[in-house]
């Protein structure tokens, strides 16, 4: 879900924090990509006659098709992608996951009715709502990335948090995801629509975290509280408080505790046993791997390995797979070209005078499994 209404709020109150551009603008950049979000996009978008692509055994291959060609597109535009996969979801997310399961049950019932009635449009709509990224989808995508020579990271917990940690640690330039909570985790740069197909003609949106805080006149802690008020994956929000009211309350009281002390509870319903404090800690100190211990290597593709993996039972066209492997190999020759700004030292941005001095805590750190470089190499 991400953060409800945050992108529109930023567009309204801090428009200078967002810029739109083409994919080629990120030539020479290393980008951490939310893998689950990508696979979900591919499972929904890569279809034939309303159904997902499958192997001869009926196994879904849409996610592999999307990963292969979309990654090649990124590489051809000079981007070095690293895919970050979700680990175990935090306990606080159980409520959100239950809601999603209930929605899928409702979609299944609606699909059964649509199938019985023979309404093709509704069948396609409810089929898409039933899409879920499984562990098998993720494992198959990881094997494909290894054969392509593209690194990936197994996050110990939330992928967006790990992406943000890689950005803050200087390992990559940005986080690429559609979920706005990458900003709540503190990613300096968030890219949306980076992995969309060319056919959709959607410009890449680049969100700048420091400029967002400047535009909203908030500290990092206040921004996290704002995101919790807007609605996140880890706890309910106060019923009746929309985006504008949330900003107004944070600007006036600065913390959720102060808001609760002054809130008109007859007008606004506070969730029972509201665990906003645990959600706050999760955003401030997420369970992530130490970026310094994450090694990222981009290697050469294993053409024969790709043909063996994707053709045959999975029914990919061999000529196209070989052509794709050659495209990846060709990008290696341009990979040595850096961006002009990489030759200069980047000075830290001038801090907003309204931002307070905050207690800097080191995030809880775990080892992440990483792979890449030589094809076929197993995660450590």
Curated annotation (Swiss-Prot):
Residues 336-344 are annotated as: Interaction with PCNA. DNA binds at residues 47, 70, 158, 231, 233. It comes from the Eukaryota. Residues 363-380 have a biased composition (Basic residues). Keywords: DNA damage, DNA repair, DNA replication, Endonuclease, Exonuclease, Hydrolase, Magnesium, Metal-binding, Mitochondrion, Nuclease, Nucleus, Phosphoprotein. Mg(2+) 1 binds at residues 34, 86, 158, 160. GO terms for biological process: base-excision repair; DNA replication, removal of RNA primer. Interacts with PCNA. Three molecules of FEN1 bind to one PCNA trimer with each molecule binding to one PCNA monomer. PCNA stimulates the nuclease activity without altering cleavage specificity. Structure-specific nuclease with 5'-flap endonuclease and 5'-3' exonuclease activities involved in DNA replication and repair. During DNA replication, cleaves the 5'-overhanging flap structure that is generated by displacement synthesis when DNA polymerase encounters the 5'-end of a downstream Okazaki fragment. It enters the flap from the 5'-end and then tracks to cleave the flap base, leaving a nick for ligation. Also involved in the long patch base excision repair (LP-BER) pathway, by cleaving within the apurinic/apyrimidinic (AP) site-terminated flap. This is Flap endonuclease 1. It comes from Aedes aegypti. The lineage of its organism: Eukaryota, Metazoa, Ecdysozoa, Arthropoda, Hexapoda.
